[in-house]
Amino acid sequence: MKKYSLPKLALIPLIIFILSGLFFLQYRIDYLRRGPDSNHTNLAPLEVIPNVLLGSFRGVLVDLLWIRGIARHEEKKFYELLAINNMIAKLQPHFPAVWIFQAWNMCYNIAFEWESPENKWRWVKAGLDFAEKGAVRNPTNGDLLFEIGYIYFHKFDSKSFKYADHYRERLEEETGKNSYRQSLYWVKKSLNYNSLLRKRIVIERTVCHILWHASLQAEKDGKQEEAYEYATESIKEWNAYLKRHPDDPGGIARDFLEKINEKMLELEQKV
């Protein structure tokens, strides 16, 4: 039985047509991922060149890297996973979900796998460094900015994590930064931009909660004046919140104001 096939020369235009279609499809996907407020000038030349050369094949390579990364995580080969994460980020620098997911994975999932506080800290710091690098490439993405601030708040809070005190000490030793001030910086900064993952009112309340937790921690550490200052800032933020939202959804603002004012009376006697 005679087999019929397309002439080899006829396949060339077909291949070119398919590759062209993939290229424009990838371009559209990239545009939608980046959004209209992206800053595309924050890439190093070594990051731009691979993206240009790979063209439409970049998406395929990224998918393969994600699969490889999941495998390395399951095998607990975390340092290989870190290298893969960096490669994915270079190929998708303006896709904030990449930075958010990988930062959380390092700060929470991978850090959890280690026993010693110091090893846990290394991965918490690696995750934050990774996320902040992403913020340089996506300076107007409210979601990424908020997540960085929330990690500084949640991961370093003694009520949430056993080794939070160690993390705060190591952060100040290595960077000179205060976790609560860092958290406030990033969360407040996120309010300047659109956020798809959280409502603005939730972010505003988070600022108030950070200040309240900072006050409680300072009091616990014996820093009464600092605790008083944080409590004062928290009251100021809650009052500003009530001016913007006089209906006080959930009815929590006034309850917190009452609680913080009571704490301030206690602190006044200690200062």
Feature roles, as predicted:
Residues 229-271:
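A cross-kingdom marker for long, charged
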Residues 8-26:
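Hydrophobic membrane-insertion alpha-helices, especially the h-region
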Residues 6, 12, 245-248:
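Intrinsic-disorder/low-complexity coil detector
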